[in-house]
Amino acid sequence: QRQMCIRDRDQINERMKQLRALSQSLHCLVLTVTQTDAAAYKTRVITRSNFSDDKRKLAHVTGMVGLNQTDEEKELGVMRLNWVVRREGAFTETTCVNVAGCLALGTPAIVSCW
């Protein structure tokens, strides 16, 4: 079981390195998603500490954005985005930008800025 877990982590790390190399060689945006830990369900803003499984994921990205939403915000169609990791420029993990719109139609609209 533990051996398989380590192999899975190594495969994910290799995939993240390959995606980073692809973005650099083609000078293009590469998007991917990842899951947080169970503690993220109880936090208002996702931070680096919510990715405890394998920190190597964070080492390969140029930027990682957290998607944050309470039940009330979900009913209102509002979501908060924050930088979890950002290689270029200063950032604060707990500073959020609010996004509202109709996500079912794929039309989020920024209603505040960082």
Cite the ranges covered by each PLM segment:
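C-terminal regions of RecA-like/P-loop NTPase motor modules
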Residues: Q3, D10-V30, A38-W114
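Conserved D-loop beta-strand region of ABC ATPase nucleotide-binding domains
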Residues: V33
